[in-house]
Amino acid sequence: MVEESELKYFVRIINTDLDGTQPVQLALTGIKGIGLHAALIIARRAGVDTRATMGLLGDEDVAAIEEQVKAYPASVPKWMVNRPVDVYSGEPKHLYGSDLSLAKEDDINLMKKMRCYRGIRHENGLKVRGQRTKATGRFGKIVGVSKRRN
């Protein structure tokens, strides 16, 4: 059994504090932009057991994981990154954390500025991806049917 003093409760990778009590694959999903599949690929390429507890890894293993996170976009096919075609550069990119949030916000603002269909739907707070809006997605005061009193 491992002593509690050896367990690091927080492991810092790519400006994100990860839960040290979780397995490596699950802990890596705490970084915005990394899902379960990407975490599995990163852990395997770093040579770390995916089921090992994150807080019990040595510094060299954490450094290897961080290197693989940085090298992830170059080591996977174009369709596996979260921005296969960047709007401005045209190159495939994989963004993490606040960079991903800012890029998504910039994309929405660009659509609003272009006044394309999706941009107009975003402006009006309506559903964007073709869902039906007659019965679901309503907002405002709820008015139900009331029973008549005798």
From Swiss-Prot:
This protein's UniProt keywords: Ribonucleoprotein, Ribosomal protein, RNA-binding, rRNA-binding
One Pfam short name: Ribosomal_S13
BP-aspect Gene Ontology terms: translation
Single GO term (MF): structural constituent of ribosome
Domain of life: Archaea
Coiled coil (UniProt feature): none
InterPro entries the UniProt entry points to: Rbsml_uS13_C, Ribosomal_uS13, Ribosomal_uS13-like_H2TH, Ribosomal_uS13_archaeal, Ribosomal_uS13_CS
GO CC annotation: cytosol; small ribosomal subunit
Family indicated by similarity: Belongs to the universal ribosomal protein uS13 family.
Assembly mode: Part of the 30S ribosomal subunit. Forms a loose heterodimer with protein S19. Forms two bridges to the 50S subunit in the 70S ribosome.
UniProt function note: Located at the top of the head of the 30S subunit, it contacts several helices of the 16S rRNA. In the 70S ribosome it contacts the 23S rRNA (bridge B1a) and protein L5 of the 50S subunit (bridge B1b), connecting the 2 subunits; these bridges are implicated in subunit movement.
Annotated protein name in UniProt: Small ribosomal subunit protein uS13
Organism: Methanocorpusculum labreanum (strain ATCC 43576 / DSM 4855 / Z)
Lineage, broadest ranks: Archaea, Methanobacteriati, Methanobacteriota, Stenosarchaea group, Methanomicrobia
Gene transcribed to yield this protein: rps13
